[in-house]
């Protein structure tokens, strides 16, 4: 009887796997069909349909490390053609970050640099991308004049350039942050970490970029940077603080209380002896309460004593 049950379950698994593979192959066939339409001169609506097919595939089959970076690159190239540069940038960054070891990554890097240089007019980010590409993809210097020329440009190393920007963010004695320089630092640190993820200074730069994003109240970017640090550099010494501050940002600034609760609980389970543990317990106990409610709870505790 057990043998029959095992064989039945095995058959179910094989049928399910075959169905999934069939769906995936069908999705690829539909993409190929739409690519042929676009190659024959599709209008913007037709092009956008193909973009959505690419993105749907990468969402539905994230484990396909061969097709996904190629599809993300093609989606970005089409969005570039449609003048949708922010979306193109986002898809290129996703392709590089999630599929860094893919052979198409250098192409994504070069198109990303083109967007920052020619379309977004962010020359600092563009030059940092080229410096990082020269570090991480030295083979590009043999084929790309931009990459080769950046090596002889006389620019200081990226970490030094970003340190200079960080020191210039507070130009006067008022303590007010220079928003343009803050944005330069956040973007510069992000693209450097993206292109040269193994750089010695990358974890510290991401941490400082997250702090800067929080200072200028770019809270969604703050969470993104903390997640990047926590997920990719778990052994970095400031990861506990990053996890706590992620929870605090979700709690205090974004009011996403259930997400904050999960982060505080994870922080306390992982780092119960951390310097921020008492703060996390207090914030968890008082999650969602107003200042008045917290004061009243103090008064009630004192009265009981």
State each model region's role.
Residues 20-305:
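Acidic, polar-rich low-complexity tracts and alpha-helical solenoid repeat scaffolds
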């Amino acid at each position: 009887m057990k043998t029959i049950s095992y064989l039945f379950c095995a058959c179910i698994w094989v049928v399910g796997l075959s169905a999934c593979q069939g769906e995936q192959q069908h999705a690829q066939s539909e993409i190929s069909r739409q690519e042929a339409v676009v190659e024959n001169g599709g209008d913007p609506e037709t092009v956008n349909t193909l973009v959505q097919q690419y993105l749907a595939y990468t969402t539905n089959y994230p484990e396909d490390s061969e097709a996904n970076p190629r599809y993300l690159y093609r989606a970005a190239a089409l969005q570039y053609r449609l003048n949708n540069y922010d979306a193109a940038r986002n898809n290129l960054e996703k392709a590089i970050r999630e599929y860094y070891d893919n052979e198409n990554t250098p192409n994504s890097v070069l198109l990303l640099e083109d967007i920052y240089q020619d379309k977004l007019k962010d020359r600092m980010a563009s030059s940092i991308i080229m410096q990082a590409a020269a570090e991480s993809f030295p083979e590009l210097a043999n084929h790309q004049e931009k990459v080769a020329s950046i090596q002889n440009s006389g620019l200081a190393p990226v970490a030094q350039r970003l340190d200079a920007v960080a020191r210039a963010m507070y130009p006067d004695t008022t303590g007010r942050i220079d928003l343009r320089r803050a944005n330069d630092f956040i973007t510069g640190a992000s693209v450097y970490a993206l292109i040269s993820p193994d750089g010695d200074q990358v974890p510290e730069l991401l941490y400082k970029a997250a702090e800067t994003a929080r200072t200028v109240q770019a809270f969604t970017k703050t969470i993104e940077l903390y997640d990047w640090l926590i997920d990719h550099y778990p052994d970095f010494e400031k990861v506990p603080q990053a996890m706590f501050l992620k929870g605090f940002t979700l709690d205090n600034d974004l009011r996403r209380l259930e997400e904050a609760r999960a982060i505080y609980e994870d922080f306390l389970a992982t780092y119960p002896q951390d310097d921020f543990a008492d703060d996390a317990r207090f914030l968890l106990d008082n999650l969602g309460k107003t200042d008045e409610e917290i004061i009243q709870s103090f008064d009630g505790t004192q009265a009981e004593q």
